[in-house]
Amino acid sequence: MKDVGFGITVQDKNAPDLVPLYKISNEMGMEFATASLHNSFYFVEAKNIIHDRSMVAKNFENLVNELLRSNSPKKWFRAYFNHGLINYIYGQKRLLPCDMSFDTFFIDPYGDVMPCNGTKDKEVMGNLNTQSWDELWNSPQAEVVRKKV
C-alpha cells in the first residue's frame, strides 16, 4: 500500500500521545499528520474546546523538536506547520495560511462546493447542480468565500 499514514486531531485527552504516535509511524515508514481540535458545521459540533492549552502546546512543541531532529526537509516543514498550530491553539493566526478554496475544495452530497468541511459556518462557493464548474469557481460568491478562509 502507498500513502498510508497516521492522523491525529489533538485535544487535551490525546496530546500526550503525539510524540509516541509519531515515533510509531516513523518506525513503520508512514506519514504523520496533525490537526488541532476545532468546531465545524459539517460535524454539527460547536463545543470543542482545548482546556489545558499550555499542556497541549508543550506536546506540540515536543513533536516539533522530534521532527526537527530528522534529516528530512519534509519533516522540517511539518515542524513549522505544527509550530503554527501552537499559535492557533492560543487564538492567534496560523503561520501558514489556509489555501482551501484556491487549489482544493470539498463537495457535499448535494452538490454544494465549499473550501472544506472544517469551517465553523457553512461557506458555499456555489452548487454544481445549478452552475457549471467554471461559472462556480470564478463566481463573485467564490471570491467572497475565499476572502473568509
Predicted regions mapped to residue ranges:
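Residues that scaffold the ATP/ADP-binding catalytic core of kinase and kinase-like folds
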Residues: 116, 136
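Cysteine/selenocysteine-centered motifs that mediate thiol-based redox chemistry or coordinate metal-sulfur cofactors
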Residues: 138-149
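Short, local alpha-helical segments
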Residues: 118-121, 143-145
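Radical SAM enzyme [4Fe-4S]-AdoMet core and its adjacent flexible, acidic
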Residues: 1-114, 120-128
